[in-house]
Amino acid sequence: MRVLGIDPGLRRTGFGVIDAEGMRLRYVASGTIVVPPALALPERLKVILDNLRQVARDTRPDVAALEIVFLNTNPASTLLLGQARGAALCALADSQLAVHEYTALQIKKAVVGTGRAAKEQVQMMVQRLLSLDGTPAPDSADALACAICHAHVGPLQARLGGLSAATGLGGGTRVRGGRLVG
């Protein structure tokens, strides 16, 4: 399974692509889309949209994983981040990719083992898990971590989806805190 992970941002959007076969992970590509701050908001969103479309065309992922927007103390920042995330979602929908969303806590826990990991810890674990020669840039590392999170959690979710169909629990059933919730 090839996973495209995205760490959305209006100034810098990180992307990372990995191949996952069982617990084996292989690095494919990563980078950061740097959006010129002088552009008007619609043009900035278009830069994100166009670049992520190109990444999807070039790397041909099977699925995408996206970090869920956090609530910031500044509502305007949260809204702007949400718009960048919307541009990313449009690019993924245009590329006909299934999108799975994870919180920063879930991503850190899947990659480092604790949801309170520092950025440097995430970068170090991404480097180790993917056998990279150097430490990935922060935005790329976050996107790769999102992809790794899906590689670890996605197959379990798929199996639980089959379980929910067999047990009649419904499609909205998820795992939260080690328990099935509806």
From Swiss-Prot:
The active site is at 7, 67, 139. This is Crossover junction endodeoxyribonuclease RuvC. GO terms for molecular function: crossover junction DNA endonuclease activity; DNA binding; magnesium ion binding. One of its GO terms (cellular component) is cytoplasm. Keywords: Cytoplasm, DNA damage, DNA recombination, DNA repair, DNA-binding, Endonuclease, Hydrolase, Magnesium, Metal-binding, Nuclease. Gene3D superfamilies: Ribonuclease H-like superfamily/Ribonuclease H (3.30.420.10). It is an enzyme of class 3 (hydrolase). Binds 2 Mg(2+) ion per subunit. PANTHER family: CROSSOVER JUNCTION ENDODEOXYRIBONUCLEASE RUVC. Its cofactor is Mg(2+). The keyword Nucleotide-binding does not apply. Belongs to the RuvC family. Mg(2+) 1 binds at residues 7, 139. GO terms for biological process: DNA recombination; DNA repair. It catalyses: Endonucleolytic cleavage at a junction such as a reciprocal single-stranded crossover between two homologous DNA duplexes (Holliday junction). It comes from the Bacteria. CDD domains: RuvC. Homodimer which binds Holliday junction (HJ) DNA. The HJ becomes 2-fold symmetrical on binding to RuvC with unstacked arms; it has a different conformation from HJ DNA in complex with RuvA. In the full resolvosome a probable DNA-RuvA(4)-RuvB(12)-RuvC(2) complex forms which resolves the HJ. Its main location: cytoplasm. The RuvA-RuvB-RuvC complex processes Holliday junction (HJ) DNA during genetic recombination and DNA repair. Endonuclease that resolves HJ intermediates. Cleaves cruciform DNA by making single-stranded nicks across the HJ at symmetrical positions within the homologous arms, yielding a 5'-phosphate and a 3'-hydroxyl group; requires a central core of homology in the junction. The consensus cleavage sequence is 5'-(A/T)TT(C/G)-3'. Cleavage occurs on the 3'-side of the TT dinucleotide at the point of strand exchange. Its EC number is 3.1.21.10. The keyword Magnesium applies. InterPro entries: RNaseH-like_sf, RNaseH_sf, X-over_junc_endoDNase_Mg_BS, X-over_junc_endoDNase_RuvC. Pfam families: RuvC. Mg(2+) 2 binds at residue 67. It is found in: Cytoplasm.
